[in-house]
């Protein structure tokens, strides 16, 4: 798919750091930002799953979807962030702009299962896309045929609840 003429520029994929001290400083800065995001999620959430169970995750990804920062959360969620972001870049290539919020829980488009909802926000420096930040949270019920949305006898995904394809909010 060709990029529109007004598409934002995309920053380089990897930061080249040769000095181990500089690498550690960058690593800790990215981890610190991800941790601060996690603290903000806990302090603003009304969900007991988030506030008490910590069943959520935060992270920072490169414009190409590489995980570069991970917050204090569930490490198992980190594997879902890159494919969920790649689903957005597939559908919205060249059409992601400052202020966009992207949502997805579709297991066929990078999500893990319907109760895990991913939110991504692109981060720009001027007109250049430099990263995405992600907050992902487990939800107790997605409106499936049984409370909790996880019915073992389901024969199709639509019986499990609301399936959200990669969308802009």
Regions found by a protein language model. Give the residues of each.
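Long, charge-dense accessory insertions within large macromolecular proteins
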Residues: 2, 11-77, 82
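Conserved mixed alpha/beta core segments that line enzyme active sites in large multi-domain catalysts
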Residues: 39-47, 66-68, 73, 81-122
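Core beta-strand residues in small-molecule sensory/regulatory alpha/beta domains
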Residues: 61-62, 120-124, 136
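A short, polar/charged loop-to-alpha-helix boundary motif
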Residues: 76-88, 140-149
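FAD-binding core of FAD-dependent oxidoreductases
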Residues: 76-79, 118, 134-137
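Mobile "lid/hinge" segments at catalytic clefts and subdomain interfaces of large enzymes
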Residues: 126-169
